[in-house]
Amino acid sequence: MATNWGSLLQDKQQLEELARQAVDRALAEGVLLRTSQEPTSSEVVSYAPFTLFPSLVPSALLEQAYAVQMDFNLLVDAVSQNAAFLEQTLSSTIKQDDFTARLFDIHKQVLKEGIAQTVFLGLNRSDYMFQRSADGSPALKQIEINTISASFGGLASRTPAVHRHVLSVLSKTKEAGKILSNNPSKGLALGIAKAWELYGSPNALVLLIAQEKERNIFDQRAIENELLARNIHVIRRTFEDISEKGSLDQDRRLFVDGQEIAVVYFRDGYMPRQYSLQNWEARLLLERSHAAKCPDIATQLAGTKKVQQELSRPGMLEMLLPGQPEAVARLRATFAGLYSLDVGEEGDQAIAEALAAPSRFVLKPQREGGGNNLYGEEMVQALKQLKDSEERASYILMEKIEPEPFENCLLRPGSPARVVQCISELGIFGVYVRQEKTLVMNKHVGHLLRTKAIEHADGGVAAGVAVLDNPYPV
């Protein structure tokens, strides 16, 4: 895709002035992060990195991503309710991956005891890149679906005003008008509010499981503020707090500091290093409770890379979404090539193909949080080490998506504005709420565009690689 801002990107003096204005507007709008030096304090904050200009995104692909989001919501919900599918799919992974195994153990314990929760809440984000086809046209291909702690809905609600401001300064009012309104934080809060309401206890609270050091607190506060506007109170606690002050009554209702909890919203708990033994015990306590968890443990497992790979097998979508051929077709159209590395002929073939053409593949472990994937020579070395080991079952191979690079100017605290070749990743936020077996809400609630320099193979905004952006539909 050719850039709309080509000539503007060549004028260094104008770029520097625009960058100053854009940064001030970002700060005024609340596009904020705590600093890496003081991640526990809001005394000193900075702007979250962002692009100076919105990046061009084909309208048809944006519409396609929105159109398929409710199908992905249904699919994740269906997977989370299918214990046999999860067990079969993850059977080889849990033998080799301790983290997935610990999550799965909690899942099994809860199933054995009987699931106490009756209201289920999904806040997810499906991420895509635009694959360059043979004829040069871009195609929407899913990278992953995030089913736990899907972030940046709050900050993405505040960036459109920044890019409108930049274009207005340039007297491009018509172009400024094309930047889509976007308010994921409101939509995500609506889902939490619906789950809270269905829980049926007006004095109960929402519990946000937070990290001790949280730079991205303003993203979370945006959702908290939306809930408070509906008179729903949120308390922030760590896993350590829960192990000290959390308890269940005889009906398995959850209490923290003596206050009943209706909804547990996890913004922690998606990486192995976030769990001590004490934290695992706290997670089990939360999982056993009657409160609506976002996500419950089965939904977190539904978001693993291994599940993503198995869903791409012929017949899997039809089995999970019976009688919904249109939804199946929409979902399948977004799938990139995904390959099992389980021990056996199929896995051997996938490894051989990746070693023969490493530039065509990405090696993915069962990890969230960005910056975990292996490419190129790193991938080749890892595959050579793994190919004769059962440990390879804890990874999947994925076709490498090759988007068309474009120029934009990236703004980061402490760094000069720089024009670089970039690629973007589009995320669509989805919300669903289920009571027992009845789906009471299923919607898409906004988008997130993140852009990074092409020299960075992997990593998101939180990992310090990508920056916030907005789609400019073309």
From Swiss-Prot:
This protein is called: Glutathione synthetase
Q: GO cellular-component terms in the record?
A: cytosol; extracellular exosome
Name the needed cofactors.
Answer: Mg(2+)
Q: Which Gene3D superfamilies does UniProt cross-reference here? A: 3.30.1490.50, 3.30.1490.80, ATP-grasp fold, B domain, Glutathione synthase, substrate-binding domain superfamily, eukaryotic, Glutathione Synthetase, Chain A, domain 3
Tell me the InterPro entries matching this sequence: Glutathione_synthase, Glutathione_synthase_a-hlx, Glutathione_synthase_C_euk, Glutathione_synthase_N_euk, GSH-S_sub-bd_sf, GSH_synth_subst-bd, PreATP-grasp_dom_sf
> Per UniProt, what does mutating residue 188 to P do?
In GSSD; 100-fold decreased glutathione synthase activity
Q: What family does this belong to?
A: Belongs to the eukaryotic GSH synthase family.
Any Pfam family from its record, for instance, is GSH_synth_ATP
Which Enzyme Commission number(s) are on file for it?
Answer: 6.3.2.3
Its quaternary organisation is: Homodimer.
Task: Give the Phosphoserine positions (modified residues).
Answer: 415
Record-annotated residues binding Mg(2+)?
Answer: 144, 146, 368
Keyword Methyltransferase set for record: no
| Binding locations of substrate | 125, 148-151, 214-216, 220, 267-270, 450, 461-462
List ligand-binding residues for ATP.
144, 305, 364-373, 375, 398-401, 425, 452, 458
Where N-acetylalanine occurs, residue numbers?
Answer: 2
What changing residue 283 to C does, per the record, is:
In GSSD; 10-fold decreased glutathione synthase activity
